[in-house]
From Swiss-Prot:
The keyword Transferase applies. It catalyses: L-methionyl-tRNA(fMet) + (6R)-10-formyltetrahydrofolate = N-formyl-L-methionyl-tRNA(fMet) + (6S)-5,6,7,8-tetrahydrofolate + H(+). InterPro entries: Fmt, Formyl_trans_C, Formyl_transf_N, Formyl_transf_N_sf, Formyl_transferase-like_C_sf, Met-tRNA-FMT_C, Met-tRNA-FMT_N. This is Methionyl-tRNA formyltransferase. One of its GO terms (cellular component) is cytosol. Belongs to the Fmt family. It comes from Paracoccus denitrificans (strain Pd 1222). Its EC number is 2.1.2.9. Keywords: Protein biosynthesis, Transferase.
Amino acid sequence: MRVIFMGTPDFSVPALRAIAARHQVVAVYSQPPRAAGRGQKPRPSPVHRAAEELGLPVRTPERLKSPQDQGDFAALQADVAVVVAYGLILPQPVLEAPWLGCLNIHASLLPRWRGAAPIHRAIMAGDAETGVAIMQMEAGLDTGPVLAEARTTIGAEDTTADLHDRLAEMGAALIVETLHRLPLPAEPQPAEGVTYAQKIDKAEARIDWGRPAAQVDRQIRGLSPFPGAWCLIGGERVKLLRSRLAAGSGAPGRVLSGFTIACGEGAVEVLEAQREGKRPMPAAEILRGMALPDRLD
């Protein structure tokens, strides 16, 4: 099958590799290289780098609105396009160019968590499970009919990083299975149960110890590794990256023992944290180099 692959971040790479091992990938579309690092030199995206490793042709248009870009896309004569966190809106002529259309791997069980940050939001909301969906793309935001889905439980200590990696592999396996079975009937999304995963705002990252422990724990895990939920310790901003619910109670922010902190209801034990300019470290290692005050702000 002739496939166009469209993706940009690390999440997309397992799907690209899985498809390239089984189908003819006629082109890989990714966002243009962006300035990154201390030198602010343009750096190709993870998908761009993976495509080059696989010897696949890469295209990096700024947008796909011009007749030239759309004509170049159609000229590839692809059977299908697979879109995984590409980051650009696809105009209708692009959506209609492959005879099997454009399929999207979305990291939620649609229609729950349409939008930009479905993994973060599922954890932060306390969802018991999530998954990946293969959706036939249309003009609306994640509104297309669903061809296939796979589910996974969200563990009590899962972070966004953990779930990201698991869902990326699940999506890769599911898209390979779906491509093998095309054409497939697609199930329209139900009108009930629609929620939107708004993009994460860094203002959401400051920890309020007055909230219930369950909410603080989900905030820490849901925002790990980026942007990282944080609190001030001795005037230093420290990111808290892993946690679990713990026994105990006290005034919000009070250090009960080790790195166990009282919340508005219950307590949270911090398992991993990151000081400014340092690598992430287990809580025990953090505590060897930093004394916690009696109470955190």
